[in-house]
Amino acid sequence: MDGIINAKYQDVAEWVPSDGALPAGTVVVLNRLKTNAVAPSAIAYDTAVAGVVSDQPGVLLGVAGDNKAKIATTGRVKVHVDARTHAVNIGDLLVTSDLPGTAMLSEPLDLGGVKIHRPGTIIGKALEPLPSGQGEILVLLSLQ
């Protein structure tokens, strides 16, 4: 392939084996019991974070099949977010929460006056605010 791809939607996703149907916006982690598969996240700050279930990816890789989900790993995608404890503002870093399939604000660690976010846990940056409660916001995915 050569040239520019013009896509209506804004993320890149791949068909990945999963445990049944997963709703769009669900944060997923590597399935620790199955090779090359994902499952909804359920642990806060999980370093096995793998992406977010996409509704309509701009670019979709792989082959569809039973028990597969479209997992976005880059681009902009709607994500289930929990802001019951801390408000989420534009630009905030998001991580997995203990609420299944849901992201939350990343609270940095203070290491001798230097604040750092836990490596390997970041899902992406909030592109929309969520002042309180639970909801779905647009996130710029940048797994790290």
State each model region's role:
Residues 1-144:
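Extracellular receptor-binding modules and their adjoining Ser/Thr/Gly/Asp/Asn-rich linkers
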